[in-house]
């Protein structure tokens, strides 16, 4: 589940740059 967590974390981090 490391990959899933990594993607989720990246999504939150990127969300700060471009809020969906």
From Swiss-Prot:
Q: Which PROSITE patterns match?
A: TCTP_3 (PS51797)
**Residues of the signal sequence?**
none
Q: What miscellaneous comment appears in this entry?
A: On the 2D-gel the determined pI of this unknown protein is: 5.1, its MW is: 20.9 kDa.
Looking up Pfam families in the UniProt record yields: TCTP
Determine the domain of life of the protein's source: Eukaryota
The text of the family note is: Belongs to the TCTP family.
> Upper lineage ranks?
Eukaryota, Discoba, Heterolobosea, Tetramitia, Eutetramitia
Q: What name does UniProt use for this protein?
A: Unknown protein NF040 from 2D-PAGE
List the InterPro entries hit by this protein, alphabetically.
Mss4-like_sf (IPR011057), Mss4/transl-control_tumour (IPR011323), TCTP (IPR034737), Translational_control_tumour_p (IPR018105)
Chain ranges of the TCTP domain: 1-20
